[in-house]
Amino acid sequence: MNIYLLRHGQTEENRKGSYYGNLDIGLNEIGVIQGNKAKKFFNDIKLDRVYVSDKIRTLEMAKLALGLKEMEIIQDSRINETNFGDFEGKTYEEIKMFYPKECLCWTDNWKEFVPPQGESYIELCKRVKSFMDDIKRLDVHNILICAHSGVIRAIYRSEEH
């Protein structure tokens, strides 16, 4: 089985340097260009399945990467980006200013720290592992997973164990 990992293209929140895992933000102009570049890569690959998170930016990216290929795109919330809770939509500098104690805890223990109303990196990894365990049971050749940088790191982490 071949698993292709594709991160969504640029968004305005990316450009601003914000944490925005749970915000449903679409691609910006550069993100659309990046999606069209991905289409060239996937043009000659026969994909059996395509998975995206439930965020619009991954759906937009997958559609651009598929080009004219007609196929079902499966949304799965287990591959959503980390929920940064109250940190959503804020830059690191803003988080340091508005949440100084929490920011220090996050810096000291980033894997286990849970932002207010959010989730930890460990919780993200558990979600992603559950998703990947299901993927490994499939009898298919080529899968595209269009997701987020944190999710892609968690996929690599799950494959190490």
Language-model segment annotations:
Residues M1-Y4:
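Extreme N-terminal starter segment of soluble prokaryotic enzymes
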Residues Q10-L64, P115-K129:
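Loop-to-helix element that buttresses phosphate recognition and phosphoryl-transfer chemistry
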Residues E12-E13, L59, E70, K129-E160:
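Active-site-adjacent alpha-helix immediately C-terminal to a catalytic or transition-state-stabilizing loop
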Residues R15-S18, E102-F113:
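Short, basic/glycine-rich phosphate-binding loops at helix/coil junctions
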Residues K16, A62-K63, K96, T107, ...:
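A short local structural element in Rossmann-fold oxidoreductases
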Residues G35, K39, Y99, C103, ...:
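Short amphipathic alpha-helical/adjacent loop interface patches that line ligand
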Residues K39-C103:
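Phosphate-coordination/substrate-recognition cap region in phosphate-metabolizing enzymes
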